[in-house]
Structure formats: C-alpha cells, structure tokens
Amino acid sequence: MALKYQRILLKISGEALGGEKGTGFDEPTMDAICGGVKKAHELGVQIGIVVGGGSFWRGRSSGKMERTLADKIGMLATVMNALAVSDKLEQLGVQTEVFTSITMPQVAPAFTRKDALRAMEEDKIAIFGGGTGNPFFSTDTTTALRAVEVSADIMFKATMVDGVYDKDPHKYPDAKKYDTLTFTKVLEDRLAVMDGTAATLCRDNKLPILVFDLADPDNIARAVQGENVGTLVYEG
C-alpha cells in the first residue's frame, strides 16, 4: 500500500513508556512501541518524535513548587525519555538522532530545523527532547511546533484511547467517538484532544492531527498508509 504521508511528527506520552504502571520504563512496552515505530519507518516515511516526560514528572502534581521550576524539571524528564527511546530504536537497528531545546552539548545537539531535516533525509528518526525550552508550554505544543518547523504532513498523537470522544469513554459508556473533527469544533467544545495553544497552532498552520490508540503499536504503520485509524482533526 502506498504511503499517505511522507513525513510525520509522532507524539508519544511519557506514561506510555511506563506500561501499566505509567512510571519509569517498562521494557516489554518499550519494545512494542519502538517496534511499531520501526515498522512504520521501514515503509519509507520520515519520522520525528516528541516524547512526554510524564513517566518521571508531572508539573501539575508538583505541589507548592514554583511553576517555572516544575516545568524545567519536566523538560529534563522529556530529555531522559528521548534518550531512552533513541537507545531502544538503535537496539532494533534504526538510526536516530536526538535534539534538545535546552543547551546540553554533552548529552545531545541543540535543535535546529536544518539539522532535524538533514537527519530525517538521511533516513534517521529525529527525536526531540526538552519541550519548547520554555515553561508553560506542553509537549503537545512542542509536537505541533516541531511539526510545523520541519514541514510535516501531519501530527500523530498516540494515546491510550482509540480516538476523540465527546466525553470520557472510561467514565461514560455512551460516549460518542468522532471519526473526523474540525479544529473549530475542538476549540469551541473544548474537546480533550490537546491544549488550546497546540490546537490553535495546528489550525493556523493547516496541520492535521490524527489521534489514535498506541495500545496496538501497529496503528502507526496503518495510519501512515491511510487506513481508518482513530480520529482525524483538520481545518474544515
């Protein structure tokens, strides 16, 4: 099957790397997720990845800590997860390059659009750590920003739910799943796709988002080939 997308930006939540516990690294889960990424990469698509830091740190659970400091710790957590995903993919025979938004040359080079594009054109998976480098911005916003910067065709948001619903499907059995949505509806109805900053950035730059379930990592390859997976959010 032909590729529907030539270049994607994939967001993986930090909690996903922790398996059922949602913390640290769960080896079988890491194997499965990175195996799914490898399968998609072997189809010929160029891939960039942003990994959240929630398996180690969540700023909203930081108690009385000052917000900017809590967010800085969260940024460092995303760097740890970026390095872990890179290592796992390399073990599977996939070349990667990690870039950070925070200057730490002993760990990884700083992000530039030119270097990220070069890496992907060299058939490497580009992995972005450190968030945007600024507090108050989510890793969803980081993913949207990097996707726009590298001219990705689409942003993939891999979650633990098989798409976007009108209400929480874990709490409400009658929740309705959307196959497609417009950014206008997402923003007006405040649907739980991503934060408003990220959604607005995608809308303004006409960057579609595909939200799908990472419980089956093969969904990444299916989505790249245009199969009906998850919920597609676009500017209608």
Range-by-range predicted roles:
Residues M1-G236:
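C-terminal catalytic "cap/lid" subdomain
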